[in-house]
Amino acid sequence: MTDPALARVLAILSGVAGADRVPREAGADTPLGENGYWLDSVDMLEVILACEHEFDISLADPDELTEEALASAGSLAALIARKLA
């Protein structure tokens, strides 16, 4: 894993999901919902807030927080990378 944003996002996801919900092979393609981290809407809010704090960015624009952007660890990391650019 060479993407530092992805590494930090994966750490946040692991913290929010808890050890019992972290997939064994978690990576960029791991879904945030079903068949992945199994995050619900409250968990997703916690992830978004943690990412805002960790990366010192705002993720408040509903046009950015699309279903596609929140589909996987990698898509969330890509959104964050765009915000940091």
Give names to the regions the model predicted:
Residues 1-39, 43-85:
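Phosphopantetheine-dependent thiolation modules in NRPS/PKS and related acyl-activating systems
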